[in-house]
Amino acid sequence: MKKHSKKILAVFAMVLALACVLTACAPAAASSGNTGSKASEAPASSKADEKPVTLKYIDYGAKPDSGNCDGIWKAVNEILLRDLNCTMDVEYLGSGDASQMALKYAGNEEFDFAYMARWWGFADNAQNNAFRALTMDELKQYAPYMVENLPDIAWQQASVNGQIFMLPNIIFEYNEGIVAYRGDLLEKYEMEKLKTMDDLDRFMETVAKNETGMEVLSADFVGELWVNYPYHLKGTTWAYDYTDADHPEMVCIAMADCYLPYAKKMREYYEKGIFSAELISDTTNGRDRFKNGLCAVTAHNSTTISNIALEVQKSHPEWKIEIFNPYMGNKVVLGAFTGNGFVVTRTSQNPTKVIEVVNHIYDSADLQKLLNFGVEGVDYEMKDGKMTMIADVPADKKMNIGCNWNMSNNLIKETFIEEERYEGYSEIRADFEKNTVSHPLQAFTFDKTAVETEVANMTAVEKEYNAIRYGLLEDVDTAVAEYRAALKSAGYDKVKAEYDRQVKEFMATYNK
């Protein structure tokens, strides 16, 4: 019996060996260096016998003229070639001009994918057939990590007219504005720390009366602080009340009841010297003005303000920067997942490979480190699994690939980095998380096709009356009345009716 068993085993071994020869058994795939999630495994389409694919990518803005840009992309391509048998050929648009990017799509230029954002013409380009629509079946097959980790609202926000067109960023962030101000001036005038908008007004009036050679307030996020947040409005020109999910409606802020009090407040700021007459034409953004000591107060989203405060703390510790949220306890909504993302172009010859690449950018710790922080040993060091940034990296070796806003995944980054936040930020963030609500219109995208002329006319009117935002018009009541009349003449009623129609249709199919 034992002899027969040995013969059988010998024959079986020969069969296995022959099978391996005939099928050219390949060795196991190399490690991808990712987080180890099964979602990060390369899909079946990435086979060893495929020819390597080069994917053309268009990035926002100009290519950096300093730093290790080419070196970073070379390292990225080594990982992509190893894991997905492809590389990226990165072209920088050269500017942040959305119309320049739209021309590339309109001209049928062949490239595979590109940076995109909801504020950078996403909906318009999608409606103009610039992008390839993505199906959920494709996403489940080629982007399993993204499907697993993004909420349904992200894919709804990435959709236009019921079709998914964007691969959204995996960032759970808030866009609500908070305030940074000069703590040294607060001490100088023996004032208590600021907690409310009234406190902020008193501080700014004091600075305006007593400080020379310094503007008080930059124009960034002024509308948000004095209109959007107190009235729970999400949006810029058109917005919705995000605390009232039972009555979804898009309203034109300039036509809303809150606009006249806001306009009068801006005039008050101008008359009290909080706004200068030159502010309307100043091309320096408020963040840089604050960092350079040109203004005493600035506002922006919470993450940006924290980073500004950290930077100024190092460059000017004597300014004793303070940050605060004047609307602690207010309801908030998460920032759009489509604030930054990727789109697959209509002309792409390798759409599913693009989806794989974007999924891998998000699921790989190696790629997250490269694309957001640079090269280990040059830009940062790892100790006990945590990242520490290296100071004084030579300019030619420093991490700098320009726009990488769409390449960050908070879920992965949190596993190896503890991001430094300014004092007070954690309490503000915790308050946001405690008071987060959702609203159906977070996923609504307006199609302006039927009212394109009227929308353009209204935009021209808004620019014409931009001085209201800076308090430059003395008779505010008359100015606002004229502004609203001009909006009416430009086609406001038709645009409003189109918004109402589309919102009604959207709500009829929402979550159906």
Question: Where do the protein language model's features map onto the residues?
Answer:
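Extracytoplasmic/secretory soluble proteins
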Residues: 2-3, 12-13, 21-512
